[in-house]
C-alpha cells in the first residue's frame, strides 16, 4: 500500500485539492476530519456516474435535501423505482446514494435487470467504510457491498476513522 499525505488548508474542501476535483480510484481516503467534502465532491464535481454507499438513512436524506438531482435509495424506494431512474432521460452524470442493504436488494438487481454495466461505468464510493467492520455483528447485511466493491473498475473507500487493512 502506498501512502500519500495531502494537507488541506483552513477553508478548503477535498475537491479544491484533488486532481480533477475527484477522489482517485483504488483509494482508501483517510480524511481525518468529518465534513471536508468527500461525498459533496463526488456529487457535485465528479464527472462520472457514481454510487455512494452511506451506512445510515439520515445522512442519505440530508444529502438528498442538499442535492435534489441525487437519487436516494432507502426504505420505501423500490427496485422498480431504481429501474425507472436508470431508464429515465440522462442529463449529466447519474448519482445514486444508498444504504448497504439498498445497494444489495435494490440497486444491484435493478442494474442487472436493465443491463447497466455498473462495474465498468460507475464509480463506487463506500463512505464511512469502518462501519462495515464495526456494525457487522448486529447488522449482517452491511457487509454485502464489500463483495461487489472489488468488481468495480473505479472505486474508493472513505473514512475519518478508517480501520486499515492488514495481512
What role is predicted for each listed range?
Residues 100-103, 111-156:
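SF2 helicase catalytic motif II
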Residues 55, 127-130, 159-162:
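Conserved H-loop
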Residues 68-113:
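Inter-Walker segment of RecA-like/P-loop motor cores
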Residues 34, 38-76, 100-102, 162-166:
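Conserved Walker A/P-loop ATP-binding site and its immediately adjacent core
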Residues 1-24:
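Pre-Walker A adenine-sensing motif
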Residues 32-39, 140-143, 159:
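Helicase motor interdomain insertion/brace
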Residues 22-30, 48-49, 94, 154:
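Pre-Walker A (Motif I) flank of P-loop NTPase domains
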